[in-house]
Amino acid sequence: MNLATKNTTIQNEIFTLTNQRALFWKKEKALILSDLHIGKTAHFRKNGIALANHIMKNDLERLSILIEYFKPEKFIVVGDLLHAGDNSDVDEFCTWKNQYSNIKFYLVEGNHDRISKTLVQKLCLDFRANQLKINDFVFVHDFDKSIEDFQITGHIHPGIVLNSAVKKIRLPCFVQTENQLLLPAFSEFTGLDTKNLPKGGRFYVFTDSEIHEI
């Protein structure tokens, strides 16, 4: 895995964007990401659609590399940790997570996070709510116009279309505006929305090896 980074300053705080679909907040020592959709592959297999199990394994391997690199004290998921409740993929995720018991685990719930009391205990969550506020930043799955503070959000799975001489290329991105930082979906097993993006923003587009502002 090639890790490329680019710093951006928001409200006098340094955030590190990565080409591996995650964000690091230096001051808070927090690794931040959105839309893992754990359980999506198992859900499809259960419904008769054959998918390789390596999809989620690859996501977790990337996450492990990010944890080893940044050494976070907090792990913040800005919604859609899960895709379809409890299944075998969730068991695998919990086994993976147990090796990082020293990291506090914060879940901002998304529209897919249907979590029972039993599943809350299984996931060993340190925090679970619809919003998380740290200093002047609010973490919420989907942008909320009623919130005055700067919002860090997910949900959209943002992407951008670039035109080359041969074809159009769709790439994931971060989008930063005056009051929002929109995160890409962490899982690679997701689509891209290239239309419903915040207006007037800066786009940080990335590939497997690079990240650039455009």
Can you name each region flagged by the protein language model?
Residues 1-78, 82-214:
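Extended recognition/assembly regions associated with phosphoester-bond processing machinery
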